[in-house]
Amino acid sequence: MSKVLKLTSVTLAASSLAAAGYFYAFDRDSYHYKNASWKRIGDHVQGILDRKEDIAVQRTSSEARDVTVRPIKETMKDLWNEQVRNTAQWVYSFGSNTSTKA
């Protein structure tokens, strides 16, 4: 019985994989394959390498902007404090979720 079960499971797995591959690559004129994000990015990169497409460049603005520069030490301290607050909130959430049964 063990061999029949093993054969059935392998057959089921292979059939599922084949069906998924068929629906991905061939069904509806390869809709999912052609519209996959990794394929679009790959086609775009290939077009750039073949010099058929240009790289999109953002235009720089001529208006002045304020830029805030902070030391990395302050940024790390803020990130640390945020993590401590989130951890404390998570720990205290266990106490608020418990209900007392009378």
Swiss-Prot record:
It is a single-pass membrane protein. InterPro entries: Mic12. Its main location: mitochondrion. Signal peptide: none annotated. GO terms for biological process: cristae formation. Component of the mitochondrial contact site and cristae organizing system (MICOS) complex. This is MICOS complex subunit MIC12. It comes from Lachancea thermotolerans (strain ATCC 56472 / CBS 6340 / NRRL Y-8284). The lineage of its organism: Eukaryota, Fungi, Dikarya, Ascomycota, Saccharomycotina.
